[in-house]
């Protein structure tokens, strides 16, 4: 793809008219929001009319005021309003979240406290710590509607969306985009605030339309953000985990399932792992990123939440004979990430379920992928891996994890990663274009002719083309375990690309691997709380760490109880709040209130309704679930025996054009004796190499390549290569007992663990306070899990 593509830079940050701190003042007739930039070099004024209770009237002063000019202006405002009620300071804030209207007055949502959570290429990233909602019309002109029970209930409902948890923004970096899109996108004037990951897009729609800019608002992403500084062999680097939750078809577990008519899926989350090397000031920053996604199975399927049935039946709706919605979904993935779409489907097999639940979706999913692939050329076909993680996990967490790492290695060979060297401050793009400013953004010709701009160019060496998409039934517990495996393998690749050497990252005793596991567990808990109503189950990670015990088992049991309670009793209010926040439901006087509608009427589009067309779907009392589609079925045995050596580019070698392929079949491996922990000398004697995941056949051990980026041949791991053990492993069949679902996968019977503890015979009335004895017995019954 050419050698070292160049990126035309954005304007230097110091020249951007970015407002970062604001003070709100009020008179009886207007609000005045005064904003300044970070360097306090200029001030701007936004006037908000308080005399109209039905319309939003905003006026932007084009003048850029100095500090002294603003002080004089405020003095005049105080004097001029002495007799009419004064010029009062209301609050300090850090940006407008948006404007919302329920039945009558408009409200303004402000960030009143922020917290710094990290930096990306010199751009500060913040989380919301506190927010405030302020009614715009003066109380003297508000009608009775503004104080009606329905209005107050809508206000309370909106507060269910807790803006102080997991909402993030940046003034100078498009946090809704991956690093590759930020640095590689040179288009101007894109509607950035309308992208799928901007959760306040609806709330800011009117102010952006009126002012034709976005300097007063911030674009919020919802999900997860964590940044950690590390050091390996004296070399310092920073790794960042970002999870971006899509606002399309967003909601709670049983009320948002599957796919909608236009291809949007439930629980759609993009996870980006960024690793950047710490370099002296003034040098370009070597930085890499890998993106993976999760999302509900993109079919029309549903489960009806029930107080009496914690594991409701899965109902598959076959109304879409040509799988058009599913095709829309994967076409969208190609547009976003490139042609190489790899699907890791963790649903259970027929032998893995005593009662067919997930099996129904697994079979239809495979059928769908085959249908889609019929009309596509080889390059564009979906590539699917069917892997019953529940079944393989029963043979040992290490073995299951080893499988997942193999899949991740193959996926990385297909998609590659993004790597560049970027100056601090790159990627801001034209954050704002405001014709009122004295220093308009220069043209590209002007930028190219400026010597100073040369230092703002990013050197791009590798591009990610495609994405790994993972799903289980809920895209929570098992999916997070699999995404950690991909993150761990990717981290080794990223460190190798950055030229950072050290002990093997995939060695789970490596502190770096443990640090990354902590981050993915925390992300998993956060995403599970958002979608499922409880933290994620911890059994898989605990088994991987070797610290699964009775205390952790009981904790997972109560996690299942909390998830069940939230799904049965709280999800309806949460879904209503999300629908109002995102603009999927817009209250109107004279029409039914949201809480008066049937539980799933948010999803349909009726004539004259006040619902958003993007959430339309046929009327059905259940929720539709979305997961991932596959191309064909991967035979694990073929995968681990395959002799394919990837090519790696040097740091200045350009982007590879390697065309890697692997087969897909609907079979399961016969042996799962993977990842046995061995002493180093035993490992070397058994395999002739310290490498995990060798790429060649077991018949040629001496010629195996170093095909795991991030690991040199001198490294000695504590894990036996999966291929070697697979070749000499036993051929006995895998038991299908003790399988578990997403919700309860970590709450298996103690008879299948190394623990000798057993739960006592259920009796008494205080087993689970607040729940019936029958339900308590169900919770503690091994058969239920």
From Swiss-Prot:
UniProt keyword terms in alphabetical order: Hydrolase, Membrane, Vacuole
Cofactor dependence: Mg(2+)
Compartment(s): Vacuole membrane
Motif (Phosphatase catalytic core): 469-480
InterPro entries linked to this entry: Fig4-like (IPR043573), SAC_dom (IPR002013)
Known catalytic reactions: a 1,2-diacyl-sn-glycero-3-phospho-(1D-myo-inositol-3,5-bisphosphate) + H2O = a 1,2-diacyl-sn-glycero-3-phospho-(1D-myo-inositol-3-phosphate) + phosphate
Broad class of where this protein is predominantly found: membrane
Domain SAC: 158-533
Tissues in which the UniProt entry reports expression: Ubiquitous with a higher level of expression in young seedlings than in other tissues.
Gene Ontology biological process terms, A to Z: phosphatidylinositol dephosphorylation
The enzyme's E.C. designation: 3.1.3.-
Gene Ontology molecular-function annotations: phosphatidylinositol-3,5-bisphosphate 5-phosphatase activity
Chain residue ranges for the region called Disordered: 688-707
A single cellular component GO annotation: vacuolar membrane
Membrane topology (UniProt): Peripheral membrane protein
Biased composition (Polar residues): 688-700
Complex formation: Component of the PI(3,5)P2 regulatory complex at least composed of ATG18, SAC/FIG4, FAB1 and VAC14.
Domain statement: The phosphatase catalytic core motif (or RXNCXDCLDRTN motif) from the SAC domain is found in metal-independent protein phosphatases and inositol polyphosphate phosphatases.
Function of the protein: The PI(3,5)P2 regulatory complex regulates both the synthesis and turnover of phosphatidylinositol 3,5-bisphosphate (PtdIns(3,5)P2).
Protein name, entry field: Phosphoinositide phosphatase SAC5
Organism: Arabidopsis thaliana (Mouse-ear cress)
């Amino acid at each position: 793809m050419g050698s070292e593509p160049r990126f035309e830079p954005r304007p230097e940050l110091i020249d951007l008219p970015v407002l970062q701190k604001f003070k709100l003042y009020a008179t009886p007739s207007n609000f005045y929001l005064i904003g300044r930039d970070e360097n306090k070099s200029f001030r701007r004024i936004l006037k908000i009319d308080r005399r109209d209770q039905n319309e939003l009237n905003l006026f932007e002063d084009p003048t850029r005021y100095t500090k002294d000019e603003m002080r004089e202006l405020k003095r005049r405002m105080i004097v001029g309003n002495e007799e009419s009620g004064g010029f009062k300071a209301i609050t300090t804030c850090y940006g407008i979240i948006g404007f919302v209207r329920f039945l009558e007055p408009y409200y303004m949502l402000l960030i009143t406290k922020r917290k710094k959570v990290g930096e990306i290429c010199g751009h500060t990233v913040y989380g919301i710590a506190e927010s405030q909602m302020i009614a715009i019309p003066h109380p003297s002109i508000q009608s009775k509607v503004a104080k009606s029970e329905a209005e107050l209930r809508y206000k309370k409902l909106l507060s269910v969306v807790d803006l102080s948890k997991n909402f993030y923004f940046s003034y100078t970096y498009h946090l809704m985009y991956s690093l590759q899109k930020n640095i590689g996108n040179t288009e101007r004037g894109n509607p950035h605030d309308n992208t799928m990951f901007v959760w306040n897009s609806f709330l800011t729609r009117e102010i952006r339309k009126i002012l034709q800019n976005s300097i007063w608002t911030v674009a919020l992403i919802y999900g997860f953000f964590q940044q950690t500084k590390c050091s390996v062999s004296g070399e310092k680097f920073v790794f960042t985990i970002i999870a971006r939750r899509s606002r399309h078809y967003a909601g709670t577990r049983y009320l948002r399932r599957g796919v909608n008519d236009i291809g949007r899926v439930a629980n759609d989350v993009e996870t980006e792992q960024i690793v950047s090397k710490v370099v002296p000031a003034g040098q370009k920053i070597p930085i890499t990123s890998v993106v993976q996604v999760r999302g509900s199975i993109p079919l029309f399927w549903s489960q009806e939440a029930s107080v009496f049935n914690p594991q409701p039946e899965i109902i598959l709706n076959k109304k879409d004979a040509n799988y058009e919605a599913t095709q829309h979904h994967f076409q969208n993935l190609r547009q976003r990430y490139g042609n190489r779409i790899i699907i890791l489907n963790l649903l259970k097999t027929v032998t893995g379920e005593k009662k067919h639940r997930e099996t129904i979706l697994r079979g239809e999913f495979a059928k769908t992928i085959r249908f889609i692939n019929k009309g596509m050329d080889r390059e564009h076909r979906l590539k699917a891996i069917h892997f019953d993680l529940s079944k393989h996990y029963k043979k040992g967490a290490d073995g299951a994890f080893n499988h997942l790492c193999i899949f991740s290695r193959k996926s990385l060979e297909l998609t590659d990663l993004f790597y560049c060297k970027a100056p601090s401050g790159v990627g801001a793009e034209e954050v704002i274009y405001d014709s009122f400013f004295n220093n308009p953004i220069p043209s590209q010709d002007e930028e190219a002719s400026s010597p100073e701009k040369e230092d703002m160019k990013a050197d791009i060496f590798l591009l990610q083309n495609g994405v790994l998409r993972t799903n289980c039934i809920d895209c929570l517990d098992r999916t997070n375990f699999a995404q950690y495996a991909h993150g761990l393998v990717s981290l080794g690749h990223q460190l190798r690309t950055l030229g950072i050497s050290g002990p093997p990252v995939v060695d789970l005793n490596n502190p770096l691997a443990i640090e990354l596991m902590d981050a993915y567990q925390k992300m998993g808990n956060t995403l599970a709380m958002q979608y499922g109503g409880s933290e994620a189950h911890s059994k898989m990670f605990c088994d991987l760490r070797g610290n699964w015990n009775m205390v952790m088992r009981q904790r997972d049991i109560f996690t299942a109880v909390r998830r069940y309670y939230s799904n049965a009793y709280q999800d309806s209010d949460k879904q209503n709040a999300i629908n109002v926040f995102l603009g999927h439901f817009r209250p109107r006087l004279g029409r039914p209130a949201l809480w008066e509608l049937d539980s799933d009427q948010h999803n349909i589009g009726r004539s004259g309704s006040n619902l958003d067309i993007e959430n339309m779907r046929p009327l059905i009392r259940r929720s539709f679930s979305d997961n991932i589609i596959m191309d064909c079925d991967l035979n694990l045995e073929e995968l681990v025996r395959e002799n394919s050596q990837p090519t790696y580019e040097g740091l200045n070698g350009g982007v590879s054009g390697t065309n890697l392929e692997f087969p897909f079949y609907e079979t399961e491996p016969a042996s799962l004796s993977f990842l046995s922990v061995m002493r180093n000398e035993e490992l070397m004697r058994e395999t002739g190499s310290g490498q995990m995941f060798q790429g060649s056949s077991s018949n040629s051990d001496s010629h195996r390549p170093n095909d795991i980026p991030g690991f040199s041949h001198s490294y000695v791991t504590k894990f036996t290569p999966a291929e070697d053990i697979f070749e000499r492993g036993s051929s006995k069949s895998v038991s299908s007992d003790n399988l578990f679902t997403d919700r309860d996968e970590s709450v298996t019977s103690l008879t299948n663990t190394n623990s000798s503890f057993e739960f006592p015979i259920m009796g008494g009335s205080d087993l689970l306070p607040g729940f019936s004895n029958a339900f308590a017995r169900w919770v503690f019954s091994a058969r239920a899990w």
